[in-house]
Amino acid sequence: MPKLRFTRWASILLLLLAAEGLRAAPPEDYRFLSLTEAAEQAGEAGKPMLLYFGRYGCTTCRKMHAEVFTDPGLRERLNRDFVLAYVDTESGNRIRLANGERTTEMQYATRNRIFGTPTFVFFSPQQKPLFKKAGFQSIEQMKQYAEYIVEGHYEGMPLADFLSKQ
């Protein structure tokens, strides 16, 4: 009987460990923070913020991790010039918003009308949302979005005009 009990507990432990591995995660080698930490850090540093909404099982997210976020130039640009935040659109993890309100990542995504992943929301250094892009974005597109914000083009030109001149 003791052997059966050990086997049952070992099975439960393995299931819990496997379930932990099923959580959505941002790409490796990027300094993604929780939304709460990123908003604080961006405000203190006066840097723009990139908010990445993803979820476990998102095939387009995996494709971006493999084909886009592996680019060394993009990695360097985003890590250097942005504060990066990641929100799992299916997570019940609790977060605290800038106004002090507590909510879950899932509720925050729904409230912000994030219905597909990946979705990227770019914020100015003043923490104003500038634009949102849903779905697969190429390396070149992500670099153009970064340039548009970091070089201040958003202050005098719509994104579409900036992109048409590239």
What do the PLM-derived regions correspond to, one by one?
Residues 20-25:
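Sec/Tat signal peptide C-region and signal peptidase I cleavage site
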Residues 45-59, 84:
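Short active-site neighborhood of thiol/selenol oxidoreductases, capturing the structured segment around
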Residues 62-79:
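Typically the conserved alpha-helix immediately C-terminal to a functionally engaged Cys/Sec
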Residues 107-111, 116-133:
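A short, hydrophobic beta-strand/beta-hairpin element that forms part of a small beta-sheet core
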Residues 136-166:
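Thiol-/selenol-based redox modules, centered on thioredoxin-like
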